[in-house]
Amino acid sequence: DMGVPILGTSADSVDAAEDRERFDEVLEKCEIDRPRGATVFTVDEALEVANKLGYPVLVRPSYVLGGAGMEIALNDGDIKKFMKIINRQFQEHPILIDKYLSGKEVEVDAVCDENGVLIPGVMEHVERAGVHSGDSISVYPPQKIKPEIKQVICDYTQRLAKALHVIGLINIQFIVYEDEVYVIEVNPRSSRTIPYISKVTD
């Protein structure tokens, strides 16, 4: 807003990755699926969406780091409890409600510029999907991901990095469910796994 240029990925691209409606447009353009879901602001909206999707659902605030505030809701009581907690901790943040897929969570860090996208490796989470990323363990190389699924993940990473015009680092979290790949979220920035993946792929 102050007219000062930002090095690396633009603020607009960061917003496109964080804003639900804009990110859905990016995914549609890239022909990539994500778990069904919606953005809500109130408990009543959350209950309506959760019952429409069917339990379990993933509840999390948007525009936060590392999956903070993320919870898996199994019923209406969980929704009411988690919405109260999230609204108290993350005031004025939209809340995302997604269908919970009990698949294998996979993570990718990549380095991008106008000439291409470098993917050092694909990391597989040990814990079930939905565990706070700061509390999870990942392994490299992935142990239970089929080569063809890994190729799809790399292809999706390329598409998303280019569509968002990322300059620098990007972190993408995927879920592999019944041999289908879904995007959970995209963070056009450095992640906690950068030091680890830079060492093990050196």
Where do the model's predicted regions map?
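Short acidic-hydrophobic, aromatic-tinged amphipathic segments that line or gate anion-handling sites
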Residues: G37-T42, I72-N75
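RNase H-like polynucleotidyl transferase catalytic core
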Residues: G8-S13, R36-T39
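ATP-dependent carboxylate activation and anion-phosphoryl transfer catalytic cores
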Residues: D1-G8, D15, E21-R22, V26-C30, ...
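Short acidic active-site motifs
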Residues: E45
